[in-house]
Amino acid sequence: MPNRNKSIFITSYKRERILLLLLKRLKDNLNYNQFNKLVIIQNGSKKLIKLIKKIDHDIRIIETNYSDKYSKFSKVNNNVFLGFKKCFEYYNSEFVIHLEDDCIPSYDFLNFFNEIYLRYKDDKKFYAINAFSKEFKLDKKFTYSKFIYGIGKGWGIPKEKWIFTKEKLKNILSSNIKKYFDSHLEWKIKKKYYVIMPYRSRVIEIPTNGLNFKIKDKNKKFYKDWKRSFLKSKKCLIEKYQYDPHMKYYWRKDCLKYNFYNKIIIYFKSFFK
């Protein structure tokens, strides 16, 4: 296998059909061959592994199984920790992306992450790149901005932030923990760093009655907006990604623009968290 300095890993649990669709969409990405690929399968099957290898024989696979004493939170957290640890410490990656198996990537998903990482990798305040959004304007396909927010639904971090992330994630790996990694990390990220968000979404979550979105949620306005925002068409030529410091973003009310005023607000709010 050729030497690659970037990786993407997918965590998967009982969503085989969507996982295979995800991998096929990912393989269509422009920068696909520049990334190591790892799939962490919880309670998987030999049949599924064969189907994954049929898509790409070079995809690495790790199988996990947990006893009943582990909470659903702890299983998710351990799988995520394992993925980052493997990619950073064994594959020696400079940048690592995590996707859950129900998040379908856009046609420029890897290109977006790659370009933004190269642009901000030397900024000590840069923590992560997120892939999600629910905004929509035709002329904003390749716009992004900086925000004081957490991570989730397709996110990537540089190696320099792995030490910080590793230390914080270790606190939620015990078997009886009842908190997911993204909510655990949120305020720790907000206090020190910014994250980058695209105006148009680079992922769409498929409702599956999983941990977050239920099948019934596909009819809600939030999900319809997210689906509209998703950059799914392959007909659009990839353009240069443009930073917009004034970009409006409404994923959640607490997703704040990265500026001096909001940093002060977050600093004082953090004492009550």
Give names to the regions the model predicted.
Residues P2-L99, C103-K273:
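Peripheral/terminal regions associated with large enzymatic or DNA-binding modules
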